[in-house]
Swiss-Prot record:
Quaternary structure note: Component of the NOP7 complex, composed of ERB1, NOP7 and YTM1. The complex is held together by ERB1, which interacts with NOP7 via its N-terminal domain and with YTM1 via a high-affinity interaction between the seven-bladed beta-propeller domains of the 2 proteins. The NOP7 complex associates with the 66S pre-ribosome.
Record localization: Nucleus, Nucleolus; Nucleus, Nucleoplasm
GO cellular component, one term: PeBoW complex
Protein name (database record): Pescadillo homolog
Domain of life: Eukaryota
Keywords: Coiled coil, Nucleus, Ribosome biogenesis, rRNA processing
PANTHER family named among the record's database cross-references: PESCADILLO - RELATED, PESCADILLO HOMOLOG
Organism placement in taxonomy: Eukaryota, Fungi, Dikarya, Ascomycota, Saccharomycotina
Coiled-coil residue spans: 460-490, 557-585
Gene label: NOP7
Amino acid sequence: MRIKKKGTSGNAKNFITRTQAVKKLQVSLADFRRLCIFKGIYPREPRNKKKANKGSTAPVTFYYAKDIQYLLHEPVLQKFREHKTFAKKLQRALGRGEVSDAARLESNRPKYSLDHVIKERYPTFLDALRDLDDPLNMLFLFANMPATDKVSHRITKDAEKLCNQWLAYVAKERLIKKVFVSIKGVYYQANVMGQEVRWLVPYKFPTNIPSDVDFRIMMTFLEFYSTLLHFVLYKLYNNANLIYPPTIDIEKLKGIGGLSAYILQTKDSVNPLIPKTKAAQTDAAGTKLDDKEISKAIEADQKDDDEDVEPGVDEVELDEFSATNKTTGDLLSQPSQYASPTSTLFSKFVFYVGREVPLDILEFCILSCGGSLVSEIAMDDLKINHPEAYKNLDLSTITHQIVDRPKVASKVAGRTYIQPQWIFDSLNQGSLLPVNSYAPGETLPPHLSPWGDAAGYDPESKKTEEGEQEDEEEEEEEVEVEEEDENQEEPEEEDEDVKEQRELEMEASGVKFSDTVEDKKKKPSKKRSAEEEEKDLKKIMMTNKQRKLYNKMQYGINKKETRQDELAKKRRKIDKKKAELQKLN
């Protein structure tokens, strides 16, 4: 039997250090990082670092050796090498002053495509949809970022265009389900082909970009994510029979911008090869037929049918087959296009959005719920550029006006005045909430996260109401016990000799008088004591390891429950104070 050589099997063979990987691939460290991001290869942690590093204990980054071997055959790697030689040739030509050669080299710059990488990493379309949260967050971040020396204007504009195309599709198909306005930005959740997609849109405030951020890595992720979103949007638009990329209204884009600048057209409306329907081909004169002419034509058809029948041939009645199972259980009702309650929530309303309200957030929410809106900013723009069209505007159809001011100077009759939070809360609820608590100047109800805290405190749950009832019952029991104690104390104070006599009788029988008073105050129920005994018996049957784990779990559960009880009590106190103030007013 041969002795195995050290470092040829096990962890030493399965793992490779980053330095060894860079040498093997013959690329720079920056290109190696880009390649790993594109291919989804990340560092690994071996069980025994010392064995993996062949006896060394120095801090090293490890990768799977098979992953690095897989990268050797990557077409993008060859393009990186070509770009390296191209950069050397271009630098040499510019150093010699050969401008024509430099221009020729620039025109033949090596370019690579990530299409095959997307297909490898996401074999099915649903896989791409499941992984869409991070790409959307990154693209919306760059879309709201100002152009700097590290991030060019072209990158931010491309990111903004992709984000608007995504928002336009979600609004057109009415896929939005949840909205939460937080300190970081606005969280949205949409249901796309059965997959929940959640993303964050930052506020459009001037941002200070930190200096310690590595933009090279972020730009690599952005490049990959933008390619992925192009694929996803193309597929989604095609499935919805829409043209991709959507046409852009340049005048609106220069003015207000936003979703109104993106015009989503179906393929049927643009394609000239698709034949028109028969109704469209008929002439206007042919459609205007009298009732007499129609009846005459029907009678003539019936006569022709009677003449075609041969004389002497008996008419045979066909058998009628009826279904034995008359139940309609097998007939599945097909869902309509807008089956969700949120998709048609604002379909009957027209909103007038004031200039003090963020238009981009409300425009997306209202359009996604089937509503229509008129913005004050758009009207100002129309008044300056097209005064004749502004005069012909009909504002009588407006049902709601969204205001973010404490008072409204002049109100228009027939309009309901609300604050922006009514839109978000109604969308999260899936139904129209009462407008009274959202009127201008009113103290708004708390805007809570629609996703809530997993196994945490939910102020709108039924548990809080049950907790209130339990607390009230406990308070009543305490009051009853106190009353009994007071009733017992009064005669004792009046007659001390009787009290001493009772104590002596208790001591003689072997029972302390103080124990009886405590038992009355506690009053434990039989059900609770039986449950506690059962728990204790189960604990006895556990091993030490199981008991420790159980105690840790119970500690965490009790901590959460105490926190929930504290918050519930706090809420009840606030509600009581509010009720008292309302009574005083």
